[in-house]
Amino acid sequence: MMNLGNRVKSVIKLTSTTGLTGKDFQATKVATFSTAQVQQAQENVRSYGGLKDKDRIFTNLYGEHDVYLKGAIARGDWYKTKNIIDKGKDWILKEMMASGLRGRGGAGFPSGLKWSFMPKTTSKDRPQYLVINADEGEPGTCKDREIMRHDPHKLIEGCLLAGFAMRACAAYIYIRGEFHYEAKVLEQAIDEAYKAGLIGENACGTGYKFDVYVHRGAGAYICGEETALIESIEGKQGKPRLKPPFPAMAGLYGCPTTVTNVETVAVAPTILRRGGAWFASFGRPKNAGTKLFCISGHVNNPCTVEEEMSIPLRELIDKHCGGVIGGWDNLKGVIPGGSSVPVLPKNICDNVLMDFDDLRQHRSGLGTAAVIVMNKETDMIAAIARLSKFYKHESCGQCTPCREGVGWLYDITDRLVTGNAKPDEIDSLEEISRQIEGHTICALGDAAAWPVQGLIRHFRPEIEDRIKQFQLNKKQSPF
Protein backbone atom coordinates (compact mmCIF):
# COMPACT_ATOMS: atom_id res chain seq x y z
CA MET A 1 0.00 0.00 0.00
CA MET A 2 1.28 3.50 -0.87
CA ASN A 3 2.40 5.42 2.25
CA LEU A 4 1.26 8.96 3.04
CA GLY A 5 4.48 10.60 1.78
CA ASN A 6 4.25 8.92 -1.61
CA ARG A 7 0.55 9.80 -1.87
CA VAL A 8 1.35 13.51 -1.27
CA LYS A 9 4.16 13.39 -3.86
CA SER A 10 1.79 11.82 -6.39
CA VAL A 11 -0.78 14.54 -5.83
CA ILE A 12 1.83 17.30 -6.17
CA LYS A 13 3.18 15.74 -9.37
CA LEU A 14 -0.30 15.39 -10.87
CA THR A 15 -1.32 18.97 -10.05
CA SER A 16 1.90 20.41 -11.40
CA THR A 17 1.56 18.63 -14.73
CA THR A 18 -2.16 19.27 -15.19
CA GLY A 19 -2.35 22.79 -13.84
CA LEU A 20 -5.09 21.86 -11.37
CA THR A 21 -5.20 23.38 -7.92
CA GLY A 22 -5.53 21.06 -4.94
CA LYS A 23 -9.24 21.94 -4.66
CA ASP A 24 -9.84 21.30 -8.37
CA PHE A 25 -8.01 18.00 -8.17
CA GLN A 26 -10.08 16.79 -5.23
CA ALA A 27 -13.29 17.72 -7.05
CA THR A 28 -12.13 15.84 -10.16
CA LYS A 29 -11.15 12.83 -8.07
CA VAL A 30 -14.53 12.73 -6.32
CA ALA A 31 -16.43 13.16 -9.58
CA THR A 32 -14.44 10.34 -11.22
CA PHE A 33 -15.03 8.04 -8.25
CA SER A 34 -18.75 8.83 -8.23
CA THR A 35 -19.07 8.05 -11.94
CA ALA A 36 -17.33 4.72 -11.42
CA GLN A 37 -19.67 3.92 -8.57
CA VAL A 38 -22.70 4.69 -10.71
CA GLN A 39 -21.39 2.54 -13.57
CA GLN A 40 -20.75 -0.35 -11.18
CA ALA A 41 -24.19 0.03 -9.66
CA GLN A 42 -25.78 0.02 -13.11
CA GLU A 43 -23.96 -3.21 -13.95
CA ASN A 44 -25.28 -4.80 -10.75
CA VAL A 45 -28.89 -3.72 -11.28
CA ARG A 46 -31.14 -6.75 -11.73
CA SER A 47 -33.66 -6.42 -14.53
CA TYR A 48 -36.94 -8.30 -14.30
CA GLY A 49 -39.10 -9.87 -16.96
CA GLY A 50 -38.40 -12.05 -19.96
CA LEU A 51 -39.47 -15.29 -18.27
CA LYS A 52 -38.08 -18.31 -20.12
CA ASP A 53 -40.30 -21.16 -21.25
CA LYS A 54 -38.43 -23.64 -19.03
CA ASP A 55 -39.48 -21.61 -15.99
CA ARG A 56 -43.16 -21.36 -16.81
CA ILE A 57 -45.47 -23.12 -14.37
CA PHE A 58 -48.63 -22.97 -16.49
CA THR A 59 -47.57 -24.80 -19.63
CA ASN A 60 -51.06 -25.15 -21.09
CA LEU A 61 -52.36 -21.67 -20.38
CA TYR A 62 -53.78 -21.29 -23.89
CA GLY A 63 -55.33 -24.75 -24.15
CA GLU A 64 -53.05 -25.94 -26.94
CA HIS A 65 -52.70 -29.41 -25.40
CA ASP A 66 -54.88 -32.02 -23.72
CA VAL A 67 -56.35 -30.54 -20.53
CA TYR A 68 -57.16 -33.86 -18.87
CA LEU A 69 -55.10 -36.40 -16.95
CA LYS A 70 -53.07 -37.97 -19.76
CA GLY A 71 -51.94 -34.59 -21.05
CA ALA A 72 -51.35 -33.26 -17.54
CA ILE A 73 -49.07 -36.18 -16.66
CA ALA A 74 -47.16 -35.66 -19.93
CA ARG A 75 -46.55 -32.05 -18.87
CA GLY A 76 -45.20 -33.10 -15.45
CA ASP A 77 -48.24 -32.89 -13.21
CA TRP A 78 -48.63 -35.60 -10.54
CA TYR A 79 -44.91 -36.45 -10.89
CA LYS A 80 -43.71 -38.12 -7.67
CA THR A 81 -46.49 -36.48 -5.68
CA LYS A 82 -46.26 -39.36 -3.20
CA ASN A 83 -42.60 -38.54 -2.56
CA ILE A 84 -43.52 -34.94 -1.75
CA ILE A 85 -46.17 -36.08 0.73
CA ASP A 86 -43.73 -38.57 2.28
CA LYS A 87 -41.39 -35.69 3.13
CA GLY A 88 -43.96 -34.51 5.63
CA LYS A 89 -46.14 -31.54 6.48
CA ASP A 90 -43.37 -29.50 8.08
CA TRP A 91 -41.15 -29.86 4.99
CA ILE A 92 -43.95 -28.64 2.72
CA LEU A 93 -44.61 -25.61 4.93
CA LYS A 94 -40.88 -24.85 5.13
CA GLU A 95 -40.49 -24.91 1.34
CA MET A 96 -43.57 -22.75 0.83
CA MET A 97 -42.23 -20.18 3.28
CA ALA A 98 -38.81 -20.28 1.61
CA SER A 99 -40.43 -19.66 -1.78
CA GLY A 100 -41.68 -16.24 -0.70
CA LEU A 101 -45.03 -16.94 -2.38
CA ARG A 102 -47.62 -14.32 -1.50
CA GLY A 103 -51.34 -14.82 -2.05
CA ARG A 104 -52.36 -14.32 -5.68
CA GLY A 105 -55.94 -13.33 -4.89
CA GLY A 106 -55.19 -9.69 -4.13
CA ALA A 107 -54.14 -9.30 -0.50
CA GLY A 108 -50.62 -10.66 -0.99
CA PHE A 109 -50.32 -12.35 2.41
CA PRO A 110 -47.38 -14.82 2.70
CA SER A 111 -48.89 -18.17 1.74
CA GLY A 112 -46.65 -20.50 3.73
CA LEU A 113 -47.31 -18.49 6.86
CA LYS A 114 -51.06 -18.55 6.24
CA TRP A 115 -51.05 -22.31 5.80
CA SER A 116 -49.17 -22.71 9.09
CA PHE A 117 -51.96 -21.01 11.07
CA MET A 118 -54.09 -24.16 10.96
CA PRO A 119 -54.19 -26.18 14.21
CA LYS A 120 -51.52 -28.88 14.45
CA THR A 121 -53.91 -31.39 16.01
CA THR A 122 -57.20 -32.64 14.58
CA SER A 123 -60.22 -34.54 15.87
CA LYS A 124 -63.18 -36.32 14.30
CA ASP A 125 -65.51 -33.80 15.87
CA ARG A 126 -63.70 -30.83 14.26
CA PRO A 127 -62.28 -31.75 10.86
CA GLN A 128 -60.20 -29.19 8.99
CA TYR A 129 -60.99 -27.87 5.53
CA LEU A 130 -59.30 -26.22 2.58
CA VAL A 131 -61.51 -23.86 0.58
CA ILE A 132 -60.43 -22.64 -2.86
CA ASN A 133 -61.75 -19.24 -3.87
CA ALA A 134 -62.56 -19.65 -7.56
CA ASP A 135 -65.29 -17.00 -7.44
CA GLU A 136 -63.42 -14.78 -9.88
CA GLY A 137 -65.72 -11.79 -10.27
CA GLU A 138 -63.35 -8.81 -10.22
CA PRO A 139 -63.84 -6.78 -13.42
CA GLY A 140 -60.84 -7.26 -15.70
CA THR A 141 -59.69 -10.47 -13.98
CA CYS A 142 -59.62 -13.75 -15.89
CA LYS A 143 -56.51 -15.65 -14.73
CA ASP A 144 -58.12 -18.31 -12.52
CA ARG A 145 -60.60 -19.07 -15.26
CA GLU A 146 -57.76 -20.01 -17.60
CA ILE A 147 -56.24 -22.32 -14.97
CA MET A 148 -59.51 -24.18 -14.40
CA ARG A 149 -60.24 -24.34 -18.12
CA HIS A 150 -56.83 -25.48 -19.36
CA ASP A 151 -54.77 -26.73 -16.39
CA PRO A 152 -57.28 -28.20 -13.91
CA HIS A 153 -54.96 -30.93 -12.64
CA LYS A 154 -52.48 -28.35 -11.38
CA LEU A 155 -55.24 -27.03 -9.15
CA ILE A 156 -56.35 -30.49 -7.98
CA GLU A 157 -52.79 -31.60 -7.18
CA GLY A 158 -52.21 -28.30 -5.41
CA CYS A 159 -55.33 -28.92 -3.32
CA LEU A 160 -53.97 -32.31 -2.27
CA LEU A 161 -50.56 -30.98 -1.23
CA ALA A 162 -51.89 -27.87 0.48
CA GLY A 163 -54.60 -29.89 2.20
CA PHE A 164 -52.06 -32.42 3.46
CA ALA A 165 -49.79 -29.67 4.83
CA MET A 166 -52.65 -28.14 6.82
CA ARG A 167 -54.19 -31.46 7.88
CA ALA A 168 -57.41 -30.90 5.91
CA CYS A 169 -59.73 -33.79 5.14
CA ALA A 170 -61.31 -32.16 2.08
CA ALA A 171 -61.14 -29.23 -0.32
CA TYR A 172 -64.15 -27.25 -1.49
CA ILE A 173 -63.60 -25.41 -4.77
CA TYR A 174 -66.11 -22.55 -4.78
CA ILE A 175 -66.46 -21.63 -8.45
CA ARG A 176 -68.24 -18.61 -9.87
CA GLY A 177 -71.75 -19.51 -11.00
CA GLU A 178 -71.25 -18.07 -14.49
CA PHE A 179 -68.30 -20.40 -15.18
CA HIS A 180 -70.37 -23.26 -16.61
CA TYR A 181 -67.70 -24.68 -18.92
CA GLU A 182 -64.91 -24.35 -16.37
CA ALA A 183 -66.97 -26.18 -13.74
CA LYS A 184 -67.62 -29.00 -16.20
CA VAL A 185 -63.91 -29.35 -17.03
CA LEU A 186 -62.97 -29.25 -13.36
CA GLU A 187 -65.51 -31.88 -12.36
CA GLN A 188 -64.32 -34.21 -15.13
CA ALA A 189 -60.70 -33.74 -14.05
CA ILE A 190 -61.65 -34.51 -10.43
CA ASP A 191 -63.41 -37.71 -11.55
CA GLU A 192 -60.23 -38.74 -13.40
CA ALA A 193 -58.13 -38.11 -10.30
CA TYR A 194 -60.45 -40.25 -8.17
CA LYS A 195 -60.39 -43.13 -10.67
CA ALA A 196 -56.59 -42.97 -10.87
CA GLY A 197 -56.28 -43.09 -7.07
CA LEU A 198 -54.66 -39.66 -6.94
CA ILE A 199 -57.27 -38.39 -4.48
CA GLY A 200 -59.83 -40.18 -2.35
CA GLU A 201 -59.46 -42.90 0.29
CA ASN A 202 -55.75 -43.52 -0.36
CA ALA A 203 -54.49 -40.44 -2.19
CA CYS A 204 -51.45 -41.30 -4.31
CA GLY A 205 -50.95 -44.46 -2.23
CA THR A 206 -49.97 -42.52 0.87
CA GLY A 207 -52.78 -43.66 3.16
CA TYR A 208 -54.02 -40.07 3.34
CA LYS A 209 -57.75 -39.65 2.73
CA PHE A 210 -58.59 -36.47 0.85
CA ASP A 211 -61.73 -35.47 -1.03
CA VAL A 212 -62.32 -32.62 -3.48
CA TYR A 213 -65.73 -31.05 -4.07
CA VAL A 214 -66.93 -28.38 -6.50
CA HIS A 215 -69.48 -25.89 -5.18
CA ARG A 216 -71.18 -23.59 -7.68
CA GLY A 217 -71.78 -19.98 -6.69
CA ALA A 218 -74.83 -17.94 -7.64
CA GLY A 219 -73.26 -14.85 -9.18
CA ALA A 220 -72.71 -12.57 -6.17
CA TYR A 221 -69.41 -10.66 -6.27
CA ILE A 222 -69.43 -10.33 -2.47
CA CYS A 223 -68.93 -14.10 -2.18
CA GLY A 224 -65.34 -13.55 -3.26
CA GLU A 225 -64.77 -12.39 0.34
CA GLU A 226 -63.59 -15.45 2.26
CA THR A 227 -66.16 -15.48 5.06
CA ALA A 228 -69.05 -14.63 2.72
CA LEU A 229 -67.88 -17.53 0.57
CA ILE A 230 -68.00 -19.83 3.61
CA GLU A 231 -71.50 -18.61 4.43
CA SER A 232 -72.57 -19.39 0.86
CA ILE A 233 -71.20 -22.94 1.00
CA GLU A 234 -73.16 -23.44 4.21
CA GLY A 235 -76.34 -22.45 2.37
CA LYS A 236 -76.72 -19.02 3.93
CA GLN A 237 -76.78 -15.53 2.43
CA GLY A 238 -73.34 -14.56 1.17
CA LYS A 239 -72.56 -11.86 3.72
CA PRO A 240 -69.14 -11.39 5.36
CA ARG A 241 -68.68 -12.41 8.97
CA LEU A 242 -67.21 -10.29 11.72
CA LYS A 243 -63.63 -11.28 12.56
CA PRO A 244 -62.37 -12.63 14.92
CA PRO A 245 -62.81 -15.52 14.99
CA PHE A 246 -60.80 -16.02 11.82
CA PRO A 247 -61.48 -18.97 9.50
CA ALA A 248 -58.33 -20.78 10.68
CA MET A 249 -60.04 -21.16 14.04
CA ALA A 250 -63.74 -21.23 13.10
CA GLY A 251 -64.46 -21.39 9.39
CA LEU A 252 -66.55 -23.79 7.33
CA TYR A 253 -69.16 -25.48 9.56
CA GLY A 254 -67.40 -23.93 12.55
CA CYS A 255 -64.22 -25.91 11.85
CA PRO A 256 -60.65 -24.71 11.13
CA THR A 257 -60.49 -23.59 7.50
CA THR A 258 -58.02 -21.96 5.16
CA VAL A 259 -59.41 -20.04 2.20
CA THR A 260 -56.95 -19.45 -0.61
CA ASN A 261 -56.86 -18.45 -4.27
CA VAL A 262 -56.79 -20.77 -7.30
CA GLU A 263 -53.45 -19.52 -8.62
CA THR A 264 -51.84 -19.65 -5.17
CA VAL A 265 -52.64 -23.35 -4.78
CA ALA A 266 -51.98 -24.25 -8.43
CA VAL A 267 -48.33 -23.12 -8.29
CA ALA A 268 -47.59 -25.12 -5.12
CA PRO A 269 -46.77 -28.50 -6.76
CA THR A 270 -44.16 -26.95 -9.07
CA ILE A 271 -42.63 -25.01 -6.17
CA LEU A 272 -42.35 -28.19 -4.11
CA ARG A 273 -40.77 -30.11 -7.01
CA ARG A 274 -38.27 -27.45 -8.02
CA GLY A 275 -37.69 -25.99 -4.58
CA GLY A 276 -38.64 -22.82 -2.76
CA ALA A 277 -35.29 -21.23 -3.62
CA TRP A 278 -36.00 -21.64 -7.34
CA PHE A 279 -39.30 -19.78 -7.06
CA ALA A 280 -37.74 -17.11 -4.83
CA SER A 281 -35.10 -16.40 -7.49
CA PHE A 282 -37.71 -14.55 -9.57
CA GLY A 283 -38.83 -11.02 -8.79
CA ARG A 284 -37.60 -8.52 -6.22
CA PRO A 285 -37.17 -9.43 -2.54
CA LYS A 286 -40.56 -9.89 -0.85
CA ASN A 287 -42.16 -10.00 -4.31
CA ALA A 288 -41.02 -13.42 -5.40
CA GLY A 289 -42.03 -15.77 -8.14
CA THR A 290 -43.87 -15.81 -11.42
CA LYS A 291 -47.34 -14.36 -11.85
CA LEU A 292 -50.28 -14.55 -14.22
CA PHE A 293 -51.13 -11.13 -15.65
CA CYS A 294 -54.37 -10.58 -17.56
CA ILE A 295 -54.11 -7.50 -19.77
CA SER A 296 -57.17 -5.96 -21.41
CA GLY A 297 -58.40 -2.63 -22.71
CA HIS A 298 -56.67 -0.47 -25.30
CA VAL A 299 -53.88 -2.88 -26.27
CA ASN A 300 -53.33 -4.48 -29.65
CA ASN A 301 -53.42 -8.05 -28.34
CA PRO A 302 -55.25 -8.55 -25.03
CA CYS A 303 -53.99 -11.68 -23.27
CA THR A 304 -53.30 -13.59 -20.09
CA VAL A 305 -49.60 -14.31 -19.69
CA GLU A 306 -47.25 -15.75 -17.10
CA GLU A 307 -44.32 -13.47 -16.38
CA GLU A 308 -41.75 -12.76 -13.70
CA MET A 309 -42.86 -10.62 -10.79
CA SER A 310 -41.47 -7.06 -10.84
CA ILE A 311 -41.51 -6.82 -14.64
CA PRO A 312 -41.88 -3.17 -15.71
CA LEU A 313 -45.46 -2.39 -16.69
CA ARG A 314 -44.39 -0.89 -20.00
CA GLU A 315 -42.38 -3.99 -20.93
CA LEU A 316 -45.31 -6.23 -20.00
CA ILE A 317 -47.65 -4.34 -22.32
CA ASP A 318 -45.21 -3.84 -25.20
CA LYS A 319 -43.79 -7.37 -25.18
CA HIS A 320 -46.92 -9.45 -24.71
CA CYS A 321 -49.74 -7.23 -25.99
CA GLY A 322 -48.13 -5.51 -28.95
CA GLY A 323 -48.24 -2.17 -27.16
CA VAL A 324 -50.94 0.39 -26.51
CA ILE A 325 -53.33 1.17 -29.36
CA GLY A 326 -51.95 4.37 -30.87
CA GLY A 327 -48.54 3.90 -29.25
CA TRP A 328 -47.21 4.38 -25.73
CA ASP A 329 -47.51 8.16 -25.97
CA ASN A 330 -51.25 7.65 -26.51
CA LEU A 331 -51.56 6.06 -23.06
CA LYS A 332 -53.76 7.88 -20.56
CA GLY A 333 -53.83 5.58 -17.56
CA VAL A 334 -53.71 2.00 -16.32
CA ILE A 335 -55.56 0.18 -13.58
CA PRO A 336 -52.80 -2.30 -12.64
CA GLY A 337 -54.57 -4.83 -10.43
CA GLY A 338 -58.24 -5.19 -11.20
CA SER A 339 -61.05 -2.71 -10.73
CA SER A 340 -60.53 -2.32 -6.98
CA VAL A 341 -57.14 -0.55 -7.12
CA PRO A 342 -56.49 3.12 -7.97
CA VAL A 343 -55.74 4.09 -11.55
CA LEU A 344 -52.23 5.31 -12.42
CA PRO A 345 -51.49 8.05 -15.01
CA LYS A 346 -48.98 7.64 -17.83
CA ASN A 347 -46.09 9.41 -16.09
CA ILE A 348 -46.12 6.76 -13.35
CA CYS A 349 -46.76 3.90 -15.78
CA ASP A 350 -43.55 4.79 -17.63
CA ASN A 351 -41.35 3.23 -14.94
CA VAL A 352 -43.52 1.38 -12.40
CA LEU A 353 -42.78 -2.28 -11.64
CA MET A 354 -45.54 -4.86 -11.47
CA ASP A 355 -45.22 -6.10 -7.91
CA PHE A 356 -46.84 -5.55 -4.54
CA ASP A 357 -44.35 -3.10 -3.06
CA ASP A 358 -43.60 -0.81 -6.00
CA LEU A 359 -47.27 -0.34 -6.83
CA ARG A 360 -48.00 0.35 -3.17
CA GLN A 361 -45.32 3.04 -3.18
CA HIS A 362 -47.21 4.67 -6.03
CA ARG A 363 -50.47 4.48 -4.04
CA SER A 364 -52.02 1.68 -6.04
CA GLY A 365 -51.75 -2.11 -5.79
CA LEU A 366 -51.05 -5.35 -7.63
CA GLY A 367 -54.40 -6.83 -6.59
CA THR A 368 -55.26 -9.67 -8.96
CA ALA A 369 -52.78 -8.38 -11.59
CA ALA A 370 -55.62 -7.60 -13.98
CA VAL A 371 -54.13 -4.80 -16.06
CA ILE A 372 -56.76 -2.52 -17.61
CA VAL A 373 -55.16 -0.21 -20.18
CA MET A 374 -56.84 3.04 -21.22
CA ASN A 375 -55.59 5.32 -23.99
CA LYS A 376 -56.38 8.98 -24.54
CA GLU A 377 -59.73 8.18 -26.13
CA THR A 378 -60.97 7.05 -22.71
CA ASP A 379 -63.33 9.20 -20.70
CA MET A 380 -61.65 8.49 -17.36
CA ILE A 381 -64.52 9.96 -15.35
CA ALA A 382 -67.04 7.73 -17.11
CA ALA A 383 -64.79 4.69 -16.63
CA ILE A 384 -64.56 5.18 -12.87
CA ALA A 385 -68.27 6.00 -12.65
CA ARG A 386 -68.99 2.64 -14.27
CA LEU A 387 -66.90 0.91 -11.62
CA SER A 388 -68.78 2.79 -8.90
CA LYS A 389 -72.03 1.51 -10.39
CA PHE A 390 -70.68 -2.03 -10.21
CA TYR A 391 -69.76 -1.75 -6.54
CA LYS A 392 -73.08 -0.13 -5.71
CA HIS A 393 -74.85 -3.09 -7.28
CA GLU A 394 -72.65 -5.70 -5.58
CA SER A 395 -72.69 -4.31 -2.04
CA CYS A 396 -74.44 -6.77 0.29
CA GLY A 397 -75.84 -3.85 2.30
CA GLN A 398 -74.73 -5.18 5.67
CA CYS A 399 -72.54 -2.18 6.59
CA THR A 400 -74.03 1.32 6.56
CA PRO A 401 -70.90 3.10 5.22
CA CYS A 402 -70.84 0.74 2.23
CA ARG A 403 -74.60 0.47 1.69
CA GLU A 404 -75.14 4.25 1.74
CA GLY A 405 -71.71 5.59 0.85
CA VAL A 406 -71.07 3.58 -2.31
CA GLY A 407 -74.43 4.73 -3.64
CA TRP A 408 -73.40 8.32 -3.00
CA LEU A 409 -70.10 7.72 -4.80
CA TYR A 410 -71.95 6.53 -7.87
CA ASP A 411 -74.53 9.32 -7.77
CA ILE A 412 -71.81 12.00 -7.75
CA THR A 413 -69.44 10.35 -10.26
CA ASP A 414 -72.37 9.74 -12.60
CA ARG A 415 -73.17 13.46 -12.58
CA LEU A 416 -69.49 14.32 -13.01
CA VAL A 417 -69.51 12.46 -16.33
CA THR A 418 -71.54 15.33 -17.79
CA GLY A 419 -70.12 17.93 -15.39
CA ASN A 420 -73.46 18.49 -13.70
CA ALA A 421 -71.97 19.14 -10.27
CA LYS A 422 -70.52 21.90 -8.13
CA PRO A 423 -66.73 22.27 -7.78
CA ASP A 424 -66.84 21.58 -4.04
CA GLU A 425 -68.49 18.22 -4.71
CA ILE A 426 -65.09 16.90 -5.75
CA ASP A 427 -63.89 17.35 -2.17
CA SER A 428 -67.17 15.90 -0.89
CA LEU A 429 -66.63 12.86 -3.11
CA GLU A 430 -63.18 12.29 -1.67
CA GLU A 431 -64.44 12.76 1.89
CA ILE A 432 -67.18 10.18 1.35
CA SER A 433 -64.60 7.70 0.03
CA ARG A 434 -62.47 8.26 3.14
CA GLN A 435 -65.46 7.64 5.39
CA ILE A 436 -66.14 4.33 3.62
CA GLU A 437 -62.52 3.15 3.56
CA GLY A 438 -61.62 1.08 6.60
CA HIS A 439 -65.09 1.32 8.15
CA THR A 440 -66.69 -1.87 6.83
CA ILE A 441 -66.62 -5.54 7.79
CA CYS A 442 -65.01 -6.59 4.51
CA ALA A 443 -62.84 -4.93 1.88
CA LEU A 444 -65.62 -4.18 -0.62
CA GLY A 445 -65.90 -0.69 0.85
CA ASP A 446 -62.19 -0.11 0.23
CA ALA A 447 -62.53 -1.56 -3.27
CA ALA A 448 -65.27 0.96 -4.06
CA ALA A 449 -63.40 3.90 -2.53
CA TRP A 450 -59.95 3.45 -4.06
CA PRO A 451 -60.85 3.90 -7.77
CA VAL A 452 -62.58 7.19 -6.90
CA GLN A 453 -59.58 8.34 -4.87
CA GLY A 454 -57.26 7.51 -7.77
CA LEU A 455 -59.45 9.49 -10.16
CA ILE A 456 -59.37 12.59 -7.96
CA ARG A 457 -55.65 12.25 -7.19
CA HIS A 458 -54.49 12.05 -10.79
CA PHE A 459 -57.29 13.47 -12.95
CA ARG A 460 -58.75 16.28 -10.88
CA PRO A 461 -58.07 18.94 -13.56
CA GLU A 462 -60.12 16.87 -16.02
CA ILE A 463 -63.02 16.78 -13.56
CA GLU A 464 -62.80 20.53 -12.95
CA ASP A 465 -62.73 21.24 -16.69
CA ARG A 466 -65.81 19.05 -17.17
CA ILE A 467 -67.71 21.05 -14.54
CA LYS A 468 -66.61 24.37 -16.05
CA GLN A 469 -67.64 23.27 -19.53
CA PHE A 470 -71.06 22.20 -18.26
CA GLN A 471 -71.59 25.56 -16.55
CA LEU A 472 -70.45 27.40 -19.70
CA ASN A 473 -72.82 25.40 -21.90
CA LYS A 474 -75.62 26.04 -19.45
CA LYS A 475 -75.08 29.81 -19.63
CA GLN A 476 -75.00 29.75 -23.43
CA SER A 477 -78.14 27.63 -23.70
CA PRO A 478 -81.31 29.61 -24.53
CA PHE A 479 -83.36 27.21 -22.38
UniProtKB/Swiss-Prot annotation:
<dbReference type="GO" id="GO:0010181">
    <property type="term" value="F:FMN binding"/>
</dbReference>
<comment type="function">
    <text>Core subunit of the mitochondrial membrane respiratory chain NADH dehydrogenase (Complex I) that is believed to belong to the minimal assembly required for catalysis. Complex I functions in the transfer of electrons from NADH to the respiratory chain. The immediate electron acceptor for the enzyme is believed to be ubiquinone.</text>
</comment>
<dbReference type="InterPro" id="IPR011538">
    <property type="entry name" value="Nuo51_FMN-bd"/>
</dbReference>
<dbReference type="InterPro" id="IPR037225">
    <property type="entry name" value="Nuo51_FMN-bd_sf"/>
</dbReference>
<feature type="binding site">
    <location>
        <position position="402"/>
    </location>
    <ligand>
        <name>[4Fe-4S] cluster</name>
    </ligand>
</feature>
<dbReference type="Pfam" id="PF22461">
    <property type="entry name" value="SLBB_2"/>
</dbReference>
<keyword id="KW-0004">4Fe-4S</keyword>
<keyword id="KW-0520">NAD</keyword>
<keyword id="KW-0408">Iron</keyword>
<keyword id="KW-0285">Flavoprotein</keyword>
<keyword id="KW-0472">Membrane</keyword>
<keyword id="KW-0813">Transport</keyword>
<keyword id="KW-0496">Mitochondrion</keyword>
<dbReference type="InterPro" id="IPR019575">
    <property type="entry name" value="Nuop51_4Fe4S-bd"/>
</dbReference>
<keyword id="KW-0679">Respiratory chain</keyword>
<keyword id="KW-0411">Iron-sulfur</keyword>
<keyword id="KW-1278">Translocase</keyword>
<keyword id="KW-0999">Mitochondrion inner membrane</keyword>
<keyword id="KW-0809">Transit peptide</keyword>
<dbReference type="Pfam" id="PF10589">
    <property type="entry name" value="NADH_4Fe-4S"/>
</dbReference>
<dbReference type="InterPro" id="IPR001949">
    <property type="entry name" value="NADH-UbQ_OxRdtase_51kDa_CS"/>
</dbReference>
<dbReference type="GO" id="GO:0031966">
    <property type="term" value="C:mitochondrial membrane"/>
</dbReference>
<dbReference type="InterPro" id="IPR054765">
    <property type="entry name" value="SLBB_dom"/>
</dbReference>
<dbReference type="GO" id="GO:0005739">
    <property type="term" value="C:mitochondrion"/>
</dbReference>
<keyword id="KW-0249">Electron transport</keyword>
<protein>
    <recommendedName>
        <fullName>NADH dehydrogenase [ubiquinone] flavoprotein 1, mitochondrial</fullName>
        <ecNumber>7.1.1.2</ecNumber>
    </recommendedName>
</protein>
<feature type="binding site">
    <location>
        <position position="442"/>
    </location>
    <ligand>
        <name>[4Fe-4S] cluster</name>
    </ligand>
</feature>
<feature type="binding site">
    <location>
        <begin position="216"/>
        <end position="264"/>
    </location>
    <ligand>
        <name>FMN</name>
    </ligand>
</feature>
<keyword id="KW-0560">Oxidoreductase</keyword>
<dbReference type="InterPro" id="IPR050837">
    <property type="entry name" value="ComplexI_51kDa_subunit"/>
</dbReference>
<keyword id="KW-0288">FMN</keyword>
<dbReference type="InterPro" id="IPR011537">
    <property type="entry name" value="NADH-UbQ_OxRdtase_suF"/>
</dbReference>
<dbReference type="InterPro" id="IPR037207">
    <property type="entry name" value="Nuop51_4Fe4S-bd_sf"/>
</dbReference>
<keyword id="KW-0479">Metal-binding</keyword>
<dbReference type="GO" id="GO:0046872">
    <property type="term" value="F:metal ion binding"/>
</dbReference>
<dbReference type="GO" id="GO:0005743">
    <property type="term" value="C:mitochondrial inner membrane"/>
</dbReference>
<dbReference type="GO" id="GO:0045271">
    <property type="term" value="C:respiratory chain complex I"/>
</dbReference>
<feature type="binding site">
    <location>
        <position position="396"/>
    </location>
    <ligand>
        <name>[4Fe-4S] cluster</name>
    </ligand>
</feature>
<dbReference type="GO" id="GO:0008137">
    <property type="term" value="F:NADH dehydrogenase (ubiquinone) activity"/>
</dbReference>
<dbReference type="GO" id="GO:0051539">
    <property type="term" value="F:4 iron, 4 sulfur cluster binding"/>
</dbReference>
<feature type="binding site">
    <location>
        <position position="399"/>
    </location>
    <ligand>
        <name>[4Fe-4S] cluster</name>
    </ligand>
</feature>
<dbReference type="Pfam" id="PF01512">
    <property type="entry name" value="Complex1_51K"/>
</dbReference>
